């Protein structure tokens, strides 16, 4: 049952990786791991980057849009080449490094994933997509408290960044066994994205388990 939980995918969670080019900010019960696998499956959709300079050269925008289109189509080999060329010519856009991190994570290349995320966060320490991807990397490598810190920073700088709330729910329930915190962040995710039937089931499950724990604690007192 636990293995089943680690493989189910939430389409709404995966869909939160928005392809906005330069503008804006930028996988026992139900499986919470699906958001953590977004970069390996449905996932791979490119993220947007925050502007590092006020003017976007037209040629840079064209290159970025072409790279994100190739990545969204699932051709990670071509997308990686395009983003590598992009960051050589235009090294000041953190979103491009985040997309490289997603590609490297898809290829299970953790060192390159970390290098790309470090580059993105050096440009913008508060970049929510970079922080979220860093949390995923840290979680995969068993660094749960560091992952928590990365996710929490993402939702602090961008409270409406639903995917980081989702990943906090995953982390708190499956790895840190903090059910009330997991419930809080799944509810925040659901409030932001709307009708996700799978997450609705998870919330019901967690609500029941939290209530049972509270009853047990009351009896013990």
Q: Residues of each region from the PLM?
A:
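Alpha-helical segment of the N-proximal tetratricopeptide repeat
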Residues: 53-93
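Helix-start (N-cap) detector for alpha-helical repeat units in TPR-like alpha-solenoids
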Residues: 60, 94-95, 128-129, 162-163, ...
């Amino acid at each position: 049952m636990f293995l089943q939980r680690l493989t189910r995918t939430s389409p709404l969670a995966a869909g939160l990786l928005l392809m906005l080019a330069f503008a804006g900010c930028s996988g026992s019960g139900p499986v919470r791991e699906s958001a953590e696998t977004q970069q390996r499956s449905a996932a791979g959709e490119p993220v947007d980057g925050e502007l590092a300079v006020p003017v976007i050269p037209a040629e840079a925008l064209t290159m970025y849009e072409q790279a994100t289109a190739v990545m969204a189509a699932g051709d990670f080999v071509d997308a990686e080449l395009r983003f590598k060329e992009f960051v050589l010519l235009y090294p000041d856009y953190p979103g491009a490094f985040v997309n490289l991190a997603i590609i490297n994570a898809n290829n299970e290349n953790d060192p390159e994933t970390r290098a790309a995320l470090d580059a993105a966060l050096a440009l913008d320490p508060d970049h929510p997509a970079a922080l979220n991807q860093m949390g995923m990397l840290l979680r995969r490598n068993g660094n749960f408290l560091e992952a928590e810190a990365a996710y929490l920073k993402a939702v602090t700088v961008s409270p409406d960044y639903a995917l980081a709330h989702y990943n906090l729910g995953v982390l708190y329930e499956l790895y840190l066994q903090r059910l009330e915190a997991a419930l809080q962040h799944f509810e925040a995710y659901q409030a932001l994205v709307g009708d996700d039937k799978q997450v609705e089931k998870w919330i019901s499950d967690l609500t029941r388990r939290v209530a049972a724990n509270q009853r047990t604690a009351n009896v013990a007192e």
